[in-house]
Amino acid sequence: KIVFYISSLSDRGAWPDINYEDKKRSGWEPKIHAERILELVKLYYSRQTSYFRSEEVKKTIHKALDYWFTTKPVCLNWWYNQIGVPKTLGTAFILFEQELTSKEKKAAISVMGNAKFGMTGQNKVWLAGNIMMRALLQNDAELVKIARDTIVSEIVTGKIEGIKDDWSFHQHGAQQQFGNYGLSFVSGMSFFSGVFAGTSLAFDERQLGIISTLIDKGYRWIMWKGKMDVSSLGRQLFHHAPIHKALSLAFSASELGGGESKQCISVACNLLKENYGVMKQNPLVGHKHFWQSDYTIHRRPQWMASVKMASDRVVGVEMMNGDNMKGFYMADGATYIYQDGDEYLDIFPLWDWRKLPGVTAFQSDDPMPIIQKCHPRNATSFVGGVSNGMYGISAMEVNRAGIKACK
């Protein structure tokens, strides 16, 4: 792979297998160019490889950077321009800073300048993280602190977006986003908590306590034998998604607090034992209804079940940027039952999306309906659940797409 990166790069600094004119809003191909730059930079500083301090690799990096700085690729989706690309290239810029020419460094700072303070929830955290990397390139200690304070300002509960009082996570309105934005939130906070540990910018115990409680009272419930529940994946239904997202959460939980918080370590140990330990029975047993997300989890020693609903308060699921284009019915009472954890692994290409488990829908050969905007799509408030911690009941009145039902 690395040989290909080096040998195939054109004189202009472009790779022949990347479509630089790509207009997709998701999976934007030019970002691969940025990812390869970061990969090469990491390799350049890796003593474990023959490419350590390689002049050939360094030359390739400079040429690839020059192409990006010269052509200035722009995606139709703002996320890549302000978050995705600066997040990837920012890491490369910082690692490669000593090798950057003054012209390259100026261009690098310009790329990072695409990120501005603003937004909410995880988008706000991503943007502030990118600004912090720009501040490091500029040796601006005050801006680093401002960015850090902006990041930790989201470690609270009860906002419209972010960590909710029921320990679910919302983004794009009142919409459960455990496996998408919420996972990025935990991953990012874990990273920053380690970076700042032992410094004047370190997270305090209250902040670490909120994040570890999100894992303890939120994420532990939606994972079963190293897989994340299908209904928590959001619109990201890609290959092996339940496995990859569970692993990402496990790594983030393990590193939260830089190994200095007893509470974080305890929560991480429980999560790891439940999902990756050799245990005959699941120790986390009970019934939990995430009342702000219309989402129910029931756990027994040998199995787990989930129910995902929507109401006039809660958005069921989103379809956007080409993702989840068949997910119209995914929150109409979808019910998944797990025993070994692999029951629904990679089933997505084979599913009849009108016959998801627990869903009531009209049978039709017409294309699946697509709704582009994130808004509540079940015209009733009678949706919810009750629980005593061990047992519970969930109920849903369906009134959408011509169907009325009580579930």
Q: How should these model regions be labeled?
A:
Residues 88-95, 234-254, 357-369:
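A short, hydrophobic/aromatic-rich structural module that often spans a beta strand
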